[in-house]
Every structure is written in structure tokens, then in C-alpha cells.
């Protein structure tokens, strides 16, 4: 088994930036599981399905699903979904579909297959608790709501999306509630996770902290 690093946390806690840069510095593969959930949610929505659809219908739609995550791009059955998953609507869809056991079951299996025997940094909301419970290092990133709203707003503006601060705040509050209260794999730190509050930390400071932990684990 390769060296596996799990990075969990709520939306806009800094997971994606930190995970991507950490993987680059270590020469590891990188998997953004949130992107796979958003892609599958958009895929199911395009097929006319919703979280309230019959489980059998969703199961059938997912049965022969093939997901590839290559250089930060997400492909479903060979079709690139990367641009489609960038909107706030895709994030809300993902949170709604992620509550379903049938969706999580299929995606956890696929995510584990992607990670098998690799040195990899994996980010998401249930990596240390569900997807990779035996990961060599588990990190849980957190930050204040105010800091997360500012980060998400800048991210959307950078993409040219017109959203207000109030809309972003409502989105994050809604996603936090859904992620933490869902019956299947709720968002929470693994018992052996290292919790890092990134509110007043720079990306470089967070990376340095995690790199130190990686070196310690690799040398034991």
C-alpha cells in the first residue's frame, strides 16, 4: 500500500488548495472526492433524477458508471464534467445527493479503487472516517464561517460568477448543516485526525505544518 494522506473539512476550509499543493510538493497523486460527488450529482440531474427519485432508478444510473480523475479534471464515462461542476448549484446538488446511501456506496468504492496502492493525497468530507480509515495521516481543516465565506466569494468571482456575500453565506450554512447532519457518513473529524484551524493561517503555514507531520509519519 502507498502512503495515503486524508484531508477532510467543511466547504471552503482550504482543502482543495492545500491538498493540491501538498501533492505537488510530495510528488503524490491527488484526488478531490468533492469533485467526483459534484460530477455525479450533475450527471444524475441531467438524467432527470433527483435525491427524491426511487433508489432503484438511481442505482441503475450508477451501475455502469466510470469515473476518471486526471490532472484535476473529472470524467464520467469519458465525458469531461469539470466545467459543469464549478457553479454554486452543483455544490448544492452534490450535498443533496451525497445524503443518499446508494450514491455514497458507489462513490466510496470508486474512490478506493482510484487510491489503491498509490502515494496519494485525498480530500473530502469522509476520507479519514470512511473512504480511507487506515490512512497514514489524517488532517481535518476548519476555519471560521466569515473566513470561509470570503474565500468562497473570491473563488466564485475569480471564475466570473456573479454572487453576493449573503448568497455565499447562505450556501455554506446550508451545506454545513446537510454535511454534518446526514445519516450516512456525516462530516466529522476522525478520532486520530490532526485538527488545524486555518482561519488566520496562510496556505504556506498550513502546508509547512502538514509537511512536518508527513515527515514524522514517514520516518516512524
UniProtKB/Swiss-Prot annotation:
The keyword Transferase applies. CDD domains: CMPK. Its EC number is 2.7.4.25. Keywords: ATP-binding, Cytoplasm, Kinase, Nucleotide-binding, Transferase. GO terms for molecular function: ATP binding; CMP kinase activity; dCMP kinase activity. ATP binds at residues 9-17. One of its GO terms (cellular component) is cytosol. Pfam families: Cytidylate_kin. It catalyses: CMP + ATP = CDP + ADP; dCMP + ATP = dCDP + ADP. One of its GO terms (biological process) is pyrimidine nucleotide metabolic process. It is an enzyme of class 2 (transferase). InterPro entries: Cytidylate_kin, Cytidylate_kinase_dom, P-loop_NTPase. It is found in: Cytoplasm. Belongs to the cytidylate kinase family. Type 1 subfamily. This is Cytidylate kinase. It comes from Thermotoga sp. (strain RQ2). The gene is cmk.
